[in-house]
UniProtKB/Swiss-Prot annotation:
The protein, known as: Glyceraldehyde-3-phosphate dehydrogenase
Lineage: Bacteria, Pseudomonadati, Pseudomonadota, Gammaproteobacteria, Pseudomonadales
Residue positions binding NAD(+): 12-13, 37, 81, 123, 185, 314
InterPro entries, per database record: GlycerAld/Erythrose_P_DH (IPR020831), GlycerAld_3-P_DH_AS (IPR020830), GlycerAld_3-P_DH_cat (IPR020829), GlycerAld_3-P_DH_NAD(P)-bd (IPR020828), Glyceraldehyde-3-P_DH_1 (IPR006424), NAD(P)-bd_dom_sf (IPR036291)
Family from the record: Belongs to the glyceraldehyde-3-phosphate dehydrogenase family.
Organism encoding this protein: Pseudomonas aeruginosa (strain ATCC 15692 / DSM 22644 / CIP 104116 / JCM 14847 / LMG 12228 / 1C / PRS 101 / PAO1)
Catalytic activities: D-glyceraldehyde 3-phosphate + phosphate + NAD(+) = (2R)-3-phospho-glyceroyl phosphate + NADH + H(+)
Keywords: Cytoplasm, Glycolysis, NAD, Nucleotide-binding, Oxidoreductase
Amino acid sequence: MTIRLAINGFGRIGRNVLRALYTGHYREQLQVVAINDLGDAAVNAHLFQYDSVHGHFPGEVEHDAESLRVMGDRIAVSAIRNPAELPWKSLGVDIVLECTGLFTSRDKAAAHLQAGAGKVLISAPGKDVEATVVYGVNHEVLRASHRIVSNASCTTNCLAPVAQVLHRELGIEHGLMTTIHAYTNDQNLSDVYHPDLYRARSATQSMIPTKTGAAEAVGLVLPELAGKLTGLAVRVPVINVSLVDLTVQVARDTSVDEVNRLLREASEGSPVLGYNTQPLVSVDFNHDPRSSIFDANHTKVSGRLVKAMAWYDNEWGFSNRMLDSALALAAARD
């Protein structure tokens, strides 16, 4: 049976989720029946079809005041500010993909349930949610009774697969992560007022240190790592693709060869973890659907101190995981 999805918020992630559904292997199992966004339908259709990062959408796209038509499929569109007023019940929505960045707490996301949706999957770290999921790492924790779930962040989705392997095989005692992260829409092209003084500065002109909860969130995904990891972000002037730089102290001495072997073996057959030995740079991973691509070229070891790096397309990889997690949530059993 096809799972009926609605997308709330048609920004970078919302649009890429829809693109991934139509250009990937998801259409036989998933159907987007509705999109709610406060923007004009004509503008949203144009932005969906033409993308500065991911190129032209390969299929036919049409629109009218009440719908977006993608490759012959009609998707109802609305512009309703209060999620509790959305027509999810009449549209038979099984799962809402909450992509606005606004309704990330359990209380706020519950408005979708009031509107008649079966479940909610949040495209961001969530507060007081029933589960935080990194597909390919802990999605087996999902249960049919879970109704409001977080898909974590793009950075946690990159970090968790690598940390899982290192902890399982070597025993992480503690560690620090830096994500060297592409700029995003919560920054500004030029200097402008922002309560975070770092993010008040031009995204295109500086490397900008800022905070992230991605490392701590790994403890929600892998409870055995709770309290062992922390980190920060450095936003850099590239439009897409980011890099996790992880340094951990492990329980025993190891070597570059062993660390690389462990990650290579873990990547074989993994739906989310890749392994790279080529001399590649960030642009080479643009539009890569994997969550985390470990780069064996940059592994460093000093006794029990290990540095590992992994690339991730912070838009496309995460958008694909939203669909994978939606499938896992729909299939979950108690």
